[in-house]
Amino acid sequence: MPTTTGTAISDDIYGYNFVTRGAVSWDREVWVGGENKGDSGHGTHVAGTVAAVNNNGVGVCGVAGGTGRNDGVKLMSCQIFSGNDATSGAITTSAEAIKYAADNGAVIIQCSFGSKAGTYTSDSAYERGSGVQYNAIKYFIESQNCDAVDGGVVIFAAGNDATAMSGYPGAYHDYISVTSFSPDYLPAYYTNYGPGCNISAPGGDYKISADAAKTYAEVLSTVPSELSEYNGADYGFMQGTSMACPHVSGVAALGLSYALEKGKKFTLDEFKTMILTSVNDMETYLDGSKTGLVLADYRKKMGTGSIDAYQLLMQVEGTPCLRAKVGTKQLVALTKYFGGSASNLTYLRVEMTRENMDKLGITEAPSISYGKLMIHCTKPGVAKISVTAIAGGGSVGGGSSMGGQEITKEFAVIARATENANGGWL
């Protein structure tokens, strides 16, 4: 898989602490008035969401953790927060880390940090006020460390101020800013939303949890067992757009990995567009209220929708997606894929393996009716299907006969419980 962060300063094999100018730390607790102002495990938690090893029967699965055969995403730990040192979180510290990442093979920078919403309210104000950081990110974007894309991918958390704008740097037009939704697929109570916000991902929301500890509705991931808060545990719960952001970074890593496997190469703008259009709809749910939130306030403000890894992989592959609503026999138009005369073509067959039918709970084989695909999915999921038609005439030519030629399109069917009129699904 592509490297999301690389190495080169002396003694940096396990990453580098750009605050202390030495080894990465994770257990520098600094207690002030009963509150830990030092290391919190935040970065470790984020890293686990991206890259925790899969299929090992332990803990959690990272979005890009691989199959368990040492094929997961590679991470470089560039620590910019450490203890309560004066340079912890400073713009100059992050700028140095970002440039280091570019110089040492990074393809994606996963940035679960940023300024409070409203600190900057325009791109030009951010460029002036945080010029050293802006220039470092520009340098990273212009780096070319992966054969699948011609620049660096920059992904930031939108912020946790419950404010109708993204915080910077995420709000900058060249970067991807990630908002957060909770397990009920509604906006998390804390998430920023509105201008500058590009896409949404799971970030947890303790307020909807029924358990006494109010943690199970948050995101479970890796934490440093040395921190007193976790009592020796290697896994813990956190919430925030910081937790949503690595879901998108992990999906981006999967997409680049798959592009390398398929021998594909995209411009940076093409790849970002693919990420931002690999989404499920959220608008359908934004009615009524939730824990004091007026959901209508979030309409068209959470970004393009909720990130969907499968859709990105299909975009990389070049396989179009057909969306179907669970529980309804429906006709899906094929005009977009077979041309304006799709309804008048002669269709020869629809092919879907029993395994793929089972994935969607299909008991009646899909067919063509009036030039549209008739399909009835009874459970949510994703699966492949192919449709074959004749281009030119009502029969296939060859031998002693004259006729058209077979054309076959493969599709990925995405079945979801809810349909939206704009073609989005969740």
Label every model-predicted segment:
Residues 47-51, 76-83, 99, 107, ...:
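Hydrolase catalytic cores
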Residues 5-12, 16-21, 167-257:
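Extracellular S/T/G-rich loop segment that most often corresponds to the catalytic His/Ser-adjacent loop
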Residues 328-329, 339-372, 409:
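Surface-exposed or secretory-pathway low-complexity segments enriched in glycine-proline
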Residues 371-384:
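Extracellular/luminal low-complexity segments enriched in Ser/Thr/Pro
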